[in-house]
Structures are given as structure tokens and as C-alpha cells.
Amino acid sequence: NTSYAECSVSPEWLNLQEFSTWCTSQPLYNKTVLGRRTALDKDLLIPNNKVYSKEACLIIPEEINKALVGKRKTGKDRGLPCGIFKHGKKFITYRDSDKRFDSFSTLEDAARDYQQKKEGRIKGLLLKYGEYLDSVTIHALQEFTIKSRSIYN
């Protein structure tokens, strides 16, 4: 997967025992939450992080982890922010709630719409999973904003 091409692992975690010790100390390690698996996240705590380490990583519900990732682009959409596509002269964003698309005349309007949808989705997932999350994860999700992240990946 090319999205991991620039990523690395901390020297400490290159020792499998150290990584394993960290994993097993995490409350959600190897658990299911509301019927969903959990996943290792590297950039909720540190936006745009490229290093897997105990300082940066969390084990969170997979649904949250996937929601944090921007929508993948096709070749013709390169140069546009994640979650925004071009169709003719219009800029398109995807509506998760009813699996439809919204269209905008300007890139700025589409980006604002994408930001509001994404942040709203994260807040909704915080409500859904909040009772299962630790205080560090809850705080990171409460502070989540698109502005702090690179949406041009």
C-alpha cells in the first residue's frame, strides 16, 4: 500500500518483545467493540505522523480508524484534497449518511463541506464508542479537526 511508503517504525518497536508488551498493555488490544475489530492507529494523537511508536499510537475501534483516513483518489482527481472529486465543472463530496453525493461550484465550498462532514462523523463515532475508550483517545477525538491535518495526500 503506497500510503505507508513514507512510514517507519521506532527503533524500540523493532524489538518484537517491546512491541508485544505495549500491545498487550492496551485496553482494546485484540478486542471487539460493538461487534467491530480494533486497529493500530498512528496519527490520531500526532496529525500526519509517519512513525509507529508508543508515543504516537493507539488501539482504537477499526470503524474510527477508517473514518480518520481520507477517501482515496482516482488518477484524474490528483491535486484535490481527500474526499473531493471533480465531475465536469463541479466539485463533489460524498455523503456517508445516505451514500449520496453533494456538488459545489467552488473547491472552497466543497472543502468546507468535506471538513464539516468529516468532523461530524468523528464526533458521532465518539458518541457511539465513547464508553469503551480511554481518556487519551477521547480527548484526541474531541480535538480532531481537519485543519490540523494534511488533506492533500
Segments the model singles out, each with a brief description of its role:
Residues P27-N30, D109, I122, T137:
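Amphipathic alpha-helical interaction segments
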